[in-house]
Amino acid sequence: TIVCDVLGEENNGTTLAAMNLIRALGAKGHTVTILCPDAQKQGVPGYAVVPTRNLGIFNGYVKSNGVQLAKPDDAVIRQAIQGADIVHVMLPFVLGRRAAQLAKAQGIPVSAGFHAMAENFTSHIFMENCAPVNRLTYHVFSKTYKMVDAIHYPTQFLRDLYEGMYGPTNGYVISNGVNASFKPCPVQKPEEYRDKFVIVATGRYSKEKNQAVLLEAANLSRHRERLQVILAGSGPKEKRLRALGKKLPVAPKFGFFPHDQMVELLNYADLYVHSAAMEAEGISCLEAISCGLVPIISNSPRCATKAYALTDRSLFQFDSPKNLAAKIDWWLDHPQDRARWGSRYAENAAGQFDQEKCMEQMERMLLETAGRRP
């Protein structure tokens, strides 16, 4: 049984990670029940649906961030975990915590994923820089993690973060993985961009993704007249980002790119910028790297993605548009270095982040935790 406090459209990292795991386990012949608050899944075979919380005047804000908050229902939870060999909790929120409690009471092994930092939650209440609130949030998370039999950490960064606060765990560091279609392939740059440098950033238009720093940096670049910034995504900060983009000589492009178009974009782009101020894993960054696109990554202490940089020229001072502009200019001024490092990035990613291999590791973790070693 997979427990998802957040599940809906595949437009956020947690939902994507959950659905990739669910599909992979199903393809391997396992029977998977999904416990979630997604009303659209009501009556769909394999799904057990709990209600969502009514937050009154905050409902609109929560919806604009692309999530729903689950309200535990013990009867639905018991039905979902009945006969399960293992329960895997995606997030340590109220539904996941209650499912873990009921599963443990029935002697069912439980594992849990560490997919969210405290700041991913506290940023929505504008308190991501308040250390006591972040510590309290981790304390709440720990109530779930302390009762489970194994913890899945998508990055070593997250394992070090949690174990630094609460001590050693039975942890497994396994990437959520990159789909095999994200790889270098010959793609012609569209005619409209032939005389432009295309810079891509992928992710929800949200405070923590910090795309504003890229738009500000583009305006400071020596190549500003030729920079075509493409912000692939959607989200609540779109209006503000569009306003910032009006300062640029070349209007930035906004919008969601279907899978195949995203692969093409990452193969004809010139640079990828990962500007997030906080990031648990950053699959979008790994997708770009896997296509052989040189990244410039925020060095924020709250970002796991900085570990993907193979050279200091792929890191920028996370709060400095000027520093980012300098890094952009260097890479654009050195196309041979860009091509050489792009190949190195693609080769490095192919060995570590293949989704099929990562899902095999996830299956092994679940079987080991369930007491059924592969």
Where do the PLM segments sit?
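Aromatic "clamp/platform" in nucleotide-sugar-dependent glycosyltransferases that forms part
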Residues: 277
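Membrane-proximal helix-turn-helix segments that form the acceptor-binding/catalytic region
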Residues: 118, 132-150, 165
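Short hydrophobic beta-strand element within catalytic cores of glycosyltransferases
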Residues: 294-298
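Carbohydrate-associated surface elements
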Residues: 38, 157, 177
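Short alpha-helical donor nucleotide-sugar binding micro-motif in glycosyltransferases
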Residues: 81, 256-257, 264-269
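Conserved acidic donor-binding segment of nucleotide-sugar-dependent glycosyltransferases
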Residues: 310-321, 330-335
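Nucleotide-activated donor-binding/catalytic signature segment of Leloir-type glycosyltransferases, i.e.
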Residues: 239-260
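Conserved donor-binding/catalytic core segment of Leloir-type glycosyltransferases
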Residues: 1, 190-219
